[in-house]
């Protein structure tokens, strides 16, 4: 495929914005108000908002959006996830979002189909300079080019103890984010009163090549028992089986996947070994 997977040892807005990017919003989200509101001024990421992209950052800055001090902006609740179900998660720019699309617009408030090839979309100025849809900023030309998003879990209650090795991707949702709500099939996970979940997205073109990562305090329920995913998780890549890490790419250090311009983009899809939907191989 042209890209090489390898470990690198070095390791506030109240309303939606048309130009904004996207994050997954849950009751357990760190930076629930979109950014850290404390008095510290030691941020190492020039982008301070949780839905902004992560790009060209050192490992301790991009991982879990630490460089934005999001780990100091505690969640206001807990994200409860039931194993062996399908859950819906909003991708948006603000908490308690509404609408069919992530910018708050309903289905009938956008041209149908919502695609850059639709003359109505072009006429309304909804095509970005990077040839993708401009609002919301989906890094996609239409639903079929939406790269896919993922949920990962670490069976750690202390977020400061979470590492890439303890995180395991548990579900992917192809052709997301596009609509505001993305649906994820959850595998047979063991119960967990307090774990750390992480949502991620790697766009496939239509703008700067970057990634997104947001942390959440989560709780897993499963009346039938379930299992804990195998760790340490493996670096994702073509044909990789079993429990896999999240994708870390396009950063100055700490990448687990190296990418050069013109190569196939590593996304949360089968091209990096992920299954579609529930990652049922994570217990093998």
UniProtKB/Swiss-Prot annotation:
Residues 1-20 form the signal peptide. It is found in: Secreted. Glycans are attached at residues 42, 96, 142, 183. Disulfide bonds join 197-218. Its cofactor is Cu(2+). The keyword Cell cycle does not apply. Pfam families: LPMO_AA14. Binds 1 copper ion per subunit. Keywords: Copper, Disulfide bond, Glycoprotein, Metal-binding, Monooxygenase, Oxidoreductase, Secreted, Signal. One of its GO terms (cellular component) is extracellular region. Its EC number is 1.14.99.-. GO terms for molecular function: metal ion binding; monooxygenase activity. InterPro entries: LPMO_AA14. It is an enzyme of class 1 (oxidoreductase). Coiled coil: none annotated. Belongs to the polysaccharide monooxygenase AA14 family. Lytic polysaccharide monooxygenase (LPMO) that plays decomposes some specific network structures formed between cellulose and hemicellulose in the plant cell walls. Catalysis by LPMOs requires the reduction of the active-site copper from Cu(II) to Cu(I) by a reducing agent and H(2)O(2) or O(2) as a cosubstrate. This is AA14 family lytic polysaccharide monooxygenase B. It comes from Talaromyces rugulosus (Penicillium rugulosum).
């Amino acid at each position: 495929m042209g890209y090489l997977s390898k470990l690198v040892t070095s390791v506030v807005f109240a309303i939606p914005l048309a130009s904004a990017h996207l994050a997954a919003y849950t009751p357990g989200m760190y930076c629930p108000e979109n950014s850290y509101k404390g008095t510290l001024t030691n941020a190492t990421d020039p982008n301070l908002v949780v839905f902004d992209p992560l790009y060209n950052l050192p490992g301790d800055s991009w991982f879990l959006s630490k460089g934005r001090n999001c780990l100091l902006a505690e969640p206001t609740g807990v994200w409860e996830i039931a194993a062996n179900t399908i859950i819906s998660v909003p991708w948006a720019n603000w908490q308690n979002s509404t609408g069919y699309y992530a910018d708050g617009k309903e289905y009938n408030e956008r041209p149908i189909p919502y695609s850059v090839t639709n003359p109505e979309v072009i006429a309304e100025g909804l095509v970005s300079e990077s040839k993708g849809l401009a609002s919301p900023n989906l890094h996609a030309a239409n639903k079929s080019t939406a790269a896919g998003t993922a949920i990962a879990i670490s069976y750690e209650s202390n977020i400061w103890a979470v590492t890439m090795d303890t995180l395991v991707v548990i579900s992917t949702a192809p052709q997301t984010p596009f609509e505001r709500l993305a649906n994820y099939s959850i595998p047979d996970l063991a119960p967990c009163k307090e774990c750390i979940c992480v949502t991620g997205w790697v766009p496939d073109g239509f703008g700067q090549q970057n990634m997104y990562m947001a942390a959440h305090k989560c709780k897993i329920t499963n009346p039938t028992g379930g299992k804990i995913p195998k760790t340490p998780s493996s670096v994702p890549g073509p044909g990789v089986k079993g429990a896999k890490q999240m994708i870390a790419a396009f950063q100055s250090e700490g990448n687990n996947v190296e990418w050069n311009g013109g190569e196939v983009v590593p996304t949360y899809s089968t091209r990096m070994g992920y299954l579609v939907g529930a990652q049922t191989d994570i217990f093998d």
